[in-house]
Design a protein with these regions (language model features):
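Start (N-cap) of specific transmembrane helices in multi-pass transporter permeases
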Residues: 47, 138-159, 234, 238
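Helical hairpin unit composed of two closely spaced alpha helices linked by a short loop
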Residues: 235-253, 257-262
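Hydrophobic alpha-helical transmembrane segments that constitute the membrane-spanning cores
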Residues: 62-65, 105-109, 145-174, 208, ...
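Membrane-interfacial helix-loop-helix connectors in multipass membrane proteins
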Residues: 73-96, 164-207, 215-235, 257-262
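Loop-to-helix entry region at the N-terminal start of transmembrane alpha-helices
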Residues: 50, 58, 62, 84-116, ...
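Short cytoplasmic-facing helical segments at TM-TM junctions of multi-pass membrane proteins
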Residues: 120-145, 228-231
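Short, membrane-interfacial amphipathic segments enriched in basic
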Residues: 1-43, 220-225
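Membrane-interface helix starts
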Residues: 36-61, 240-243
Length: 262
């Protein structure tokens, strides 16, 4: 029993390492075919619209409600200590450091990442990618690379929008509804949030998350089994793997950015 369990675990580890190597080789190939996005920027613009603009609604609404909850919870906590003016700092730091990049990346993986995987998988199932190869059109350059870069560019922008609307939500619930002094809200935020230590590190996080989610989405779509069930499984793997990757990367980046390493 123990031997069988260890054997299965070993096979799973070896398979994961092999799949990671295949994925790395695939992404390297996609990156080497990226010149097409400069020669034909329309392809990139279309993919930014597909991955970014069409994700705006869920990002804006989610960011607003997260900000409302943060403001309400922060106010109730700080009220006990007579520091309600610092609620702006709590909301802003929570969003720009953590919740903005992480939650927007999870939402991006669920909405855009799954859609990218499904589109590539369906193109593979209907043999559109094979038809491109027969016509001497490289699908990595024509299809995969623009999708990858569209997701990669969209992710940091969506994270910034999420944080902005989150701060707006925090302002609305604490200043407009509850009655916290608006001047103290903004003054405390401006005094406590540092551009390089807080905002820039949050942007770096969102860039890393964008690379990870976009890489996983295009790889899972291209490697999907060309059947309806295969595409469905690939979409599921994209969402699950992206979520785990984002959370793991968030821990690593936070450890080095804000604590100097563990």
């Amino acid at each position: 029993m123990i031997v069988k369990t260890l054997t299965s675990l070993g096979h799973a580890i070896i398979d994961s390492i092999w799949r990671l190597g295949v994925a790395s080789s695939f992404i390297a190939k996609v990156l080497t075919r990226s010149s097409i996005v400069l020669r034909r920027p329309r392809l990139l613009v279309d993919e930014i619209h597909f991955a970014g603009v069409l994700s705006m609604v869920i990002i804006v609404v989610s960011g607003l409600f997260v900000g409302l909850v943060l403001g309400l919870q922060g106010y109730e906590t700080l009220k006990r200590y007579g520091s309600t003016g610092a609620v702006g700092t709590l909301v802003a730091l929570s969003l720009v450091r953590e919740l903005g990049p992480v939650v927007s990346a999870l939402l991006f993986a669920s909405r855009a990442g799954s859609a990218i995987t499904a589109e590539i998988g369906i193109m593979k199932t209907t043999e559109q990618l094979s038809a491109m190869e027969m016509m001497a059109v490289d699908p990595h350059a024509r299809v995969i690379s623009p999708m990858f870069w569209g997701g990669f560019i969209s992710m940091p922008l969506l994270a910034a929008i999420f944080s902005a609307f989150g701060i707006l939500g925090g302002y609305l619930i604490t200043v407009v509804v509850i009655g916290v002094d608006g001047g103290a809200f903004w003054a405390q935020m401006q005094a406590s949030v540092d551009f390089y230590h807080d905002i820039l590190n949050g942007v770096i996080k969102s860039v890393v998350f964008g690379f990870a989610v976009s890489s996983i989405a295009v790889f899972e779509g291209y490697s999907a089994v060309p059947t309806a069930e295969g595409v469905s499984r690939a979409v599921t793997r994209t969402v699950v793997t992206s979520a785990l990757a984002v959370l793991a990367l968030d821990f690593v980046l936070t450890a080095f950015m804000f604590t100097g390493g563990v």
